[in-house]
Regions:
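Active-site-proximal loop/hinge segments within enzyme catalytic domains
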Residues: 56-141
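Alpha-helical oligomerization interface recognition
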Residues: 1-50, 54, 60
Length: 141
């Protein structure tokens, strides 16, 4: 589920380990509100989830862990479900590692495939069947 708001630092610092987020992409690729849709629309063959410490920016926090899977041939609902399951499993493991002191957060490499995925509006993201350049109409519904 996308939230799309930037929380103030005072709130992010309240929990003992900070606020932890599950993001449905391999950050820093596809930061933002619609990473799954953008992965489908740009023809990615693999994507995944990132467990990260939240920061004041939009999906800019340090990363604790990532896991990937093949996404070719899946539509949005199917992929969303697969990534949610993968994210839940990785979150449990990562939280155990954070609590035990085994986890180490890694700064996102801004030079490594940084992309921003804005909101997926009905007419801007293929949801309204608009064709993207050099793309067949992917089934993101």
């Amino acid at each position: 589920a996308a939230y799309g708001k930037i929380l103030p630092k005072e709130l992010l610092d309240l929990p003992r380990f900070g606020c932890i987020n599950v993001h449905a992409s391999l950050l820093p690729k596809f930061r933002g509100a619609s990473p799954i849709q953008h992965a489908i629309l740009t023809g990615e063959t693999h994507s995944g989830v990132t467990i990260m410490k939240m920061a004041e920016g939009l999906d800019t926090g340090d990363m604790y862990s990532q896991a990937s899977l093949e996404i070719a041939g899946y539509n949005y609902p199917e992929l969303s479900e697969r990534l949610a399951k993968l994210g839940a499993e990785l979150l449990l493991k990562t939280m155990d590692d954070i609590e035990s002191g085994k986890a180490h957060a890694e700064v996102q490499d801004e030079k490594k495939h940084f992309t921003q995925s804005g909101k997926c509006e009905k007419n801007s993201c293929g949801c309204g069947r608009r064709k993207w350049p050099n793309q067949l109409e992917p089934d993101i519904h």
